[in-house]
Amino acid sequence: MQKILGYMRKAIQEFDLISDGDSIAVGISGGKDSLVLLNGLALLRRFIGIDYRLVGITLDPQFKGTPGDFSSVAGLCSGLDIKYHIIQTHIGEIVFDIRKEENPCSLCARMRRGALHDAAKQYGCNKIALGHHYNDAIETFIMNLFNEGRIGCFSPKSYLSRKDITS
């Protein structure tokens, strides 16, 4: 974990990702990427010299109409003294039952991102942190190339003016 914290600290400083007084919504899927990010940001608060607040947010798409079980994530957030919110959505129903998408990933991702932005604003956050790794970046690059005919990937920091939030 020490090596990961070093990488996180370097990225925070190099890309000016966190400032004093920031309130950061951490998107938590329950997977290893988002949980490592959450733990890392919680640990860094102790010694990085930047005062910031963390809010954990999980979007439950309720695939097949069934709510997810995020009790282990809730327990982790409680142990880290991080407020945690589960947002029940109808994304699964919209993507699969109403729209009947043949390639659901893009629509699902856009809907989740929009719902996360709304939730972050609702809970007073000015920034959103998402856990990604190299495989995510490569997958995004290839999907953009084949599906949209463009070369591109996500940047470490972006600003969404219509929501006044940094992601």
Which role does the model predict for each range below?
Residues 153-167:
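Short, flexible loop segments at boundaries between secondary-structure elements
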Residues 1-151, 155-156:
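ATP-dependent adenylation/nucleotidyltransferase module used to activate substrates
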